[in-house]
Swiss-Prot record:
Pfam families: UDG (PF03167). GO terms for biological process: base-excision repair, AP site formation via deaminated base removal. CDD domains: UDG-F1-like. PROSITE patterns: U_DNA_GLYCOSYLASE. Its EC number is 3.2.2.27. It comes from Ruegeria sp. (strain TM1040) (Silicibacter sp.). One of its GO terms (cellular component) is cytoplasm. The gene is ung. Keywords: Cytoplasm, DNA damage, DNA repair, Hydrolase. This is Uracil-DNA glycosylase.
Length: 234
């Protein structure tokens, strides 16, 4: 097999994102490091690139950046902030996201599974795509961040809404090309900072207002029925 063919064979099946240089320059080294790990790695390998698989570049309308996957087994499945539908109680950041959505729109999803957002063009991308179980930020030095940089560069070749929650996400704004974008910057929804500018930001209605002004369909963030609050009571 020629070197170029071998590099192509190593690339995950992530549609148009597979053409990013990251998969030739960085992924082989990261993959080798993961293969040497003795700790449990989250999410499972088949879900590691789920965000890119579910929201290809041509469908991406909104990008919500996260940090790294939840380090609790059974929670992370490859989309930032999202958890499997049977997870209760919700992680605290996601709980705050839903509280803000309920205040903004009067409703929120019934579970923590955000796959329906991804299907509508919301790219839920962590800047680091793996984590050792129980060790938040345990893989921050593997080089994953280069993928996020390249995704931002490619996605910003056309108007896109970017949600940058917290200082770490906001540092990546420099990788967004100038353009007719919506860039929302607030405090992170974590309990430590949510009251310093995240609550009251009305980010979900702001994104939909921007999309509809461009003649695009809004994101259905949740069932239009009013939230009953059950996910907040567990």
């Amino acid at each position: 097999m020629a070197p170029q063919d071998h590099a192509s064979a190593l690339r995950p099946a992530v549609g148009g994102w597979a053409e990013l240089p990251f998969f030739e320059t960085h992924w082989p080294r990261i993959e080798a490091a993961l293969a040497q790990e003795t700790r449990q790695i989250l999410p499972p390998a088949h879900q590691r690139f789920a965000a890119l698989e579910r929201t290809p570049p041509e469908s991406t309308r909104v990008v919500i950046l996260g940090q790294d996957p939840y380090p609790t087994p059974g929670h992370a499945h490859g989309l930032s902030f999202s958890v499997e539908p049977d997870v209760t109680p919700l992680p605290r950041s996601l709980r705050n996201i839903y509280q803000e959505m309920r205040d903004d729109l009067g409703t929120c999803p019934e579970t923590g599974d955000l796959r329906p957002w991804a299907a509508q063009g919301v790219l839920l991308l962590n800047t680091v795509l793996s984590v050792p179980a129980g060790e938040a930020n345990g893989h921050k030095s593997l080089g994953w961040q280069e993928l996020a940089h390249q995704v931002l560069d490619l996605s910003s070749r056309r108007p896109t809404a970017y949600v940058l929650w917290g200082n770490q996400a906001q540092k990546l704004e420099s990788h967004i090309r100038p353009g007719d974008h919506l860039i929302v910057k607030t405090a992170h929804p974590s309990p430590l900072s949510a009251r310093r500018g995240f609550f009251g930001s009305r980010v979900f209605s702001a994104i939909n207002d921007w999309l509809t002004a461009r003649g695009e369909p809004p994101i259905t963030w949740a069932d239009p029925r009013p939230a009953q609050g059950s996910i907040f009571d567990v």
